[in-house]
Protein backbone atom coordinates (compact mmCIF):
# COMPACT_ATOMS: atom_id res chain seq x y z
CA UNK A 1 0.00 0.00 0.00
CA UNK A 2 1.50 3.31 -1.11
CA UNK A 3 2.12 6.07 1.42
CA UNK A 4 0.33 9.31 0.53
CA UNK A 5 1.21 12.20 2.85
CA UNK A 6 -0.89 15.32 3.27
CA UNK A 7 0.41 18.25 5.31
CA UNK A 8 -1.96 20.25 7.53
CA UNK A 9 -2.03 22.77 10.37
CA UNK A 10 -4.45 23.12 13.25
CA UNK A 11 -7.01 25.86 12.75
CA UNK A 12 -7.75 28.21 15.63
CA UNK A 13 -10.42 30.46 14.12
CA UNK A 14 -13.69 29.00 12.87
CA UNK A 15 -16.81 30.35 11.21
CA UNK A 16 -17.64 31.70 7.77
CA UNK A 17 -15.47 34.78 8.13
CA UNK A 18 -12.43 32.77 9.19
CA UNK A 19 -12.96 30.27 6.37
CA UNK A 20 -13.23 33.10 3.85
CA UNK A 21 -9.94 34.58 5.08
CA UNK A 22 -8.26 31.19 4.81
CA UNK A 23 -9.35 30.79 1.20
CA UNK A 24 -8.07 34.26 0.33
CA UNK A 25 -4.72 33.19 1.79
CA UNK A 26 -4.58 30.08 -0.41
CA UNK A 27 -5.68 27.65 2.29
CA UNK A 28 -8.64 25.28 2.66
CA UNK A 29 -10.67 24.79 5.85
CA UNK A 30 -11.01 21.11 6.74
CA UNK A 31 -11.96 18.80 9.60
CA UNK A 32 -10.86 15.42 10.99
CA UNK A 33 -13.50 13.36 12.78
CA UNK A 34 -14.25 9.82 13.87
CA UNK A 35 -12.86 7.35 16.35
CA UNK A 36 -12.79 8.11 20.07
CA UNK A 37 -11.15 11.52 19.63
CA UNK A 38 -12.91 14.83 19.23
CA UNK A 39 -13.18 16.48 15.81
CA UNK A 40 -10.21 18.70 14.94
CA UNK A 41 -10.40 21.74 12.65
CA UNK A 42 -7.42 22.02 10.33
CA UNK A 43 -6.27 23.97 7.30
CA UNK A 44 -4.67 22.65 4.12
CA UNK A 45 -2.59 24.16 1.36
CA UNK A 46 -4.91 24.65 -1.61
CA UNK A 47 -2.30 23.91 -4.26
CA UNK A 48 -1.38 20.61 -2.60
CA UNK A 49 -5.02 19.49 -2.37
CA UNK A 50 -5.89 20.74 -5.86
CA UNK A 51 -3.13 18.57 -7.31
CA UNK A 52 -3.97 15.60 -5.06
CA UNK A 53 -7.69 15.62 -5.94
CA UNK A 54 -6.83 15.07 -9.59
CA UNK A 55 -5.48 11.62 -8.69
CA UNK A 56 -7.46 8.44 -8.19
CA UNK A 57 -5.59 7.49 -5.00
CA UNK A 58 -6.84 10.58 -3.17
CA UNK A 59 -10.37 9.15 -3.06
CA UNK A 60 -9.72 5.47 -2.36
CA UNK A 61 -6.51 5.26 -0.30
CA UNK A 62 -5.54 5.61 3.34
CA UNK A 63 -3.94 9.05 3.65
CA UNK A 64 -1.18 9.95 6.09
CA UNK A 65 -2.28 13.32 7.48
CA UNK A 66 0.66 15.15 9.03
CA UNK A 67 -0.70 17.88 11.34
CA UNK A 68 1.75 20.58 12.51
CA UNK A 69 4.72 18.39 11.65
CA UNK A 70 3.71 15.71 14.15
CA UNK A 71 3.14 12.02 13.60
CA UNK A 72 0.91 11.12 10.71
CA UNK A 73 -2.74 10.32 11.37
CA UNK A 74 -4.36 7.69 9.18
CA UNK A 75 -7.50 9.07 7.51
CA UNK A 76 -9.85 8.57 4.58
CA UNK A 77 -11.31 11.34 2.45
CA UNK A 78 -15.05 11.42 3.13
CA UNK A 79 -16.16 14.67 1.51
CA UNK A 80 -14.68 17.31 -0.77
CA UNK A 81 -16.63 20.45 -1.66
CA UNK A 82 -15.73 22.34 -4.83
CA UNK A 83 -16.73 25.81 -5.98
CA UNK A 84 -19.56 25.52 -8.55
CA UNK A 85 -17.63 27.24 -11.36
CA UNK A 86 -14.18 28.30 -10.11
CA UNK A 87 -11.18 25.99 -9.75
CA UNK A 88 -11.37 26.01 -5.97
CA UNK A 89 -11.72 23.36 -3.28
CA UNK A 90 -13.93 24.88 -0.58
CA UNK A 91 -13.83 22.33 2.26
CA UNK A 92 -12.52 18.84 3.01
CA UNK A 93 -13.69 16.19 5.50
CA UNK A 94 -11.38 13.40 6.68
CA UNK A 95 -12.39 10.38 8.77
CA UNK A 96 -9.96 8.74 11.18
CA UNK A 97 -9.08 5.13 10.46
CA UNK A 98 -8.62 2.42 13.07
CA UNK A 99 -6.31 -0.46 12.16
CA UNK A 100 -8.68 -3.06 13.62
CA UNK A 101 -11.98 -1.69 12.23
CA UNK A 102 -13.25 -2.62 8.78
CA UNK A 103 -13.87 0.13 6.24
CA UNK A 104 -16.50 0.48 3.55
CA UNK A 105 -14.88 2.25 0.62
CA UNK A 106 -15.54 2.77 -3.10
CA UNK A 107 -12.54 1.35 -4.98
CA UNK A 108 -11.99 2.03 -8.72
CA UNK A 109 -11.87 -0.78 -11.27
CA UNK A 110 -8.99 -0.98 -13.75
CA UNK A 111 -9.77 -2.97 -16.90
CA UNK A 112 -6.78 -4.75 -18.47
CA UNK A 113 -6.19 -6.75 -21.68
CA UNK A 114 -9.32 -5.40 -23.36
CA UNK A 115 -7.67 -4.63 -26.72
CA UNK A 116 -6.16 -8.13 -27.00
CA UNK A 117 -9.33 -10.00 -25.98
CA UNK A 118 -11.44 -11.84 -28.61
CA UNK A 119 -14.12 -9.15 -28.29
CA UNK A 120 -11.54 -6.37 -28.45
CA UNK A 121 -10.11 -7.72 -31.71
CA UNK A 122 -13.49 -8.36 -33.34
CA UNK A 123 -14.91 -5.76 -35.71
CA UNK A 124 -18.24 -4.09 -35.08
CA UNK A 125 -18.18 -4.85 -31.36
CA UNK A 126 -18.77 -2.39 -28.52
CA UNK A 127 -17.38 -3.14 -25.05
CA UNK A 128 -19.24 -1.24 -22.35
CA UNK A 129 -18.01 -0.71 -18.79
CA UNK A 130 -21.20 -0.68 -16.73
CA UNK A 131 -19.35 -0.06 -13.44
CA UNK A 132 -16.17 1.92 -12.82
CA UNK A 133 -15.95 1.31 -9.07
CA UNK A 134 -17.21 -1.10 -6.42
CA UNK A 135 -17.88 -0.67 -2.70
CA UNK A 136 -15.73 -3.06 -0.69
CA UNK A 137 -15.28 -3.92 2.97
CA UNK A 138 -11.83 -4.62 4.44
CA UNK A 139 -9.31 -3.70 7.11
CA UNK A 140 -7.17 -0.62 6.36
CA UNK A 141 -4.06 -2.75 5.77
CA UNK A 142 -5.88 -4.67 3.01
CA UNK A 143 -7.40 -1.69 1.19
CA UNK A 144 -6.34 -1.72 -2.49
CA UNK A 145 -5.96 1.49 -4.48
CA UNK A 146 -7.78 -0.25 -7.34
CA UNK A 147 -9.01 -3.68 -8.41
CA UNK A 148 -7.97 -5.14 -11.76
CA UNK A 149 -10.54 -6.79 -14.00
CA UNK A 150 -8.85 -9.04 -16.57
CA UNK A 151 -10.72 -8.97 -19.89
CA UNK A 152 -8.30 -11.24 -21.78
CA UNK A 153 -10.96 -13.94 -22.30
CA UNK A 154 -13.85 -11.57 -23.04
CA UNK A 155 -15.73 -12.78 -26.12
CA UNK A 156 -18.56 -11.29 -28.16
CA UNK A 157 -21.89 -11.65 -26.36
CA UNK A 158 -20.15 -12.24 -23.03
CA UNK A 159 -21.13 -10.39 -19.84
CA UNK A 160 -18.79 -10.11 -16.85
CA UNK A 161 -20.62 -9.86 -13.52
CA UNK A 162 -19.48 -8.85 -10.05
CA UNK A 163 -19.26 -12.53 -9.13
CA UNK A 164 -16.62 -13.00 -11.86
CA UNK A 165 -14.19 -10.49 -10.31
CA UNK A 166 -11.29 -11.82 -8.24
CA UNK A 167 -10.88 -9.67 -5.14
CA UNK A 168 -7.61 -9.40 -3.20
CA UNK A 169 -7.23 -11.42 0.00
CA UNK A 170 -9.08 -9.75 2.86
CA UNK A 171 -11.31 -7.70 0.54
CA UNK A 172 -14.98 -8.41 -0.09
CA UNK A 173 -18.01 -6.63 -1.49
CA UNK A 174 -19.83 -4.43 1.01
CA UNK A 175 -23.19 -5.86 -0.07
CA UNK A 176 -24.15 -9.52 -0.09
CA UNK A 177 -23.92 -10.99 -3.57
CA UNK A 178 -26.95 -12.85 -4.91
CA UNK A 179 -28.75 -13.12 -8.24
CA UNK A 180 -30.51 -9.77 -7.75
CA UNK A 181 -27.30 -7.91 -6.87
CA UNK A 182 -24.88 -9.66 -9.26
CA UNK A 183 -24.61 -6.61 -11.49
CA UNK A 184 -23.06 -6.58 -14.95
CA UNK A 185 -19.61 -4.98 -14.97
CA UNK A 186 -18.62 -5.36 -18.63
CA UNK A 187 -20.75 -6.16 -21.68
CA UNK A 188 -19.42 -7.01 -25.17
CA UNK A 189 -21.91 -6.97 -28.01
CA UNK A 190 -22.20 -6.32 -31.73
CA UNK A 191 -23.23 -2.86 -32.85
CA UNK A 192 -26.73 -2.84 -34.28
CA UNK A 193 -27.00 -0.38 -37.16
CA UNK A 194 -30.56 0.58 -37.94
CA UNK A 195 -31.49 1.48 -41.49
CA UNK A 196 -33.13 4.89 -41.31
CA UNK A 197 -33.77 5.05 -45.07
CA UNK A 198 -37.54 5.41 -45.56
CA UNK A 199 -39.08 2.65 -47.60
CA UNK A 200 -40.58 3.71 -50.90
CA UNK A 201 -44.35 3.72 -50.94
CA UNK A 202 -46.02 1.21 -53.16
CA UNK A 203 -46.73 2.56 -56.58
CA UNK A 204 -44.35 5.52 -56.21
CA UNK A 205 -42.93 6.44 -59.58
CA UNK A 206 -45.59 4.49 -61.50
CA UNK A 207 -46.94 6.23 -64.59
CA UNK A 208 -50.50 6.07 -65.64
Swiss-Prot record:
Residues 1-20 are annotated as: Disordered. One of its GO terms (cellular component) is cytosolic large ribosomal subunit. GO terms for molecular function: 5S rRNA binding; structural constituent of ribosome. Keywords: Ribonucleoprotein, Ribosomal protein, RNA-binding, rRNA-binding. Pfam families: Ribosomal_L25p, Ribosomal_TL5_C. Disulfide bonds: none annotated. GO terms for biological process: translation. InterPro entries: Rbsml_bL25/Gln-tRNA_synth_N, Ribosomal_bL25/Gln-tRNA_synth, Ribosomal_bL25_b-dom, Ribosomal_bL25_C, Ribosomal_bL25_long, Ribosomal_bL25_short, Ribosomal_L25_dom, Ribosomal_uL5_bac-type. Coiled coil: none annotated. HAMAP family: Ribosomal_bL25 (MF_01336), Ribosomal_bL25_CTC (MF_01334). This is one of the proteins that binds to the 5S RNA in the ribosome where it forms part of the central protuberance. Belongs to the bacterial ribosomal protein bL25 family. CTC subfamily. This is Large ribosomal subunit protein bL25. The gene is rplY.
